[in-house]
Amino acid sequence: MRILLAEDDELLGSGIRAGLAQHGFQVDWVRDGVAAERELATGAYQAAVLDLGLPRQDGMEVLRQTRARRNTTPVLVLTARDAVPARIEGLDAGADDYLIKPIDLHELAA
C-alpha cells in the first residue's frame, strides 16, 4: 500500500516513515502543504497522513482542496491540537480519522 505522509517535523516524519515501512507500507514523504496537495492530486496513494500544521499551506486547506476535487483517498489528520472544535473541523472537512501527536505507530499502521 502506498501512503503519502505530509509532516514538516523531521524527527517525527522520519519516525512515522520508518514505522510504517516496517509494517510493509511504501511511504512518500513531503514536508509542506503545497507538495501534499500536488501529490494527492495525482491519485497515486491508497491513504494519506496529513499534519494540520504544515508550512506554505496548512493541512486543513490541503484536505478541503483534495475533497473539493472529489478525491476520496482516505486521509488521517495528524495534529498536536487535542480540542473538540479542531476534531470537528477536520472531520467536517473530510478527514477519515483524527490522530493526536504523539502517535502510536502500531495504531497508525492498523
Q: Model-found features: residue ranges?
A:
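N-terminal/domain-start alpha-helical segments
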Residues: 1-110
